[in-house]
């Protein structure tokens, strides 16, 4: 599962999820991808479940890129504990996803296989997504 090797601070503020994604809004590495339509926290377990669903459907064919990383810690207090006495212990890691962000990319498989694999992956995620293709510019790909 994905998690940072080391962090400067063990606990972070929750923050706001306003606006659209600044970067990572286009398919760069693969041919097909899924793009977030809503803002949400996506946990490292959800990312891993989506990755497994895709690779199992593709039967180890093709290549998968994970474009998000869970770098934000979230905390939780134990059950039946009174309020106060500080912030809770770190519980897990999340990736902050805003609308427009490409989450996963796939290449090396047909469009039908990619569409189904990404559909299965999207069912593991807590947000609405859409299937996107690499944009062609003047008849050739935007790879340089």
From Swiss-Prot:
Family annotation (PROSITE patterns): RIBOSOMAL_L16_1, RIBOSOMAL_L16_2
Gene3D superfamilies in UniProt: Ribosomal protein L10e/L16
A single MF term (Gene Ontology): structural constituent of ribosome
Alphabetized UniProt keyword annotations: Ribonucleoprotein, Ribosomal protein, RNA-binding, rRNA-binding, tRNA-binding
GO biological process, one term: translation
InterPro entries: Ribosomal_uL16 (IPR047873), Ribosomal_uL16_bact-type (IPR000114), Ribosomal_uL16_CS (IPR020798), Ribosomal_uL16_dom (IPR016180), Ribosomal_uL16_sf (IPR036920)
Subunit-level organization: Part of the 50S ribosomal subunit.
Family: Belongs to the universal ribosomal protein uL16 family.
Name of protein: Large ribosomal subunit protein uL16
Species, as recorded: Bacillus subtilis (strain 168)
Gene from which the chain derives: rplP
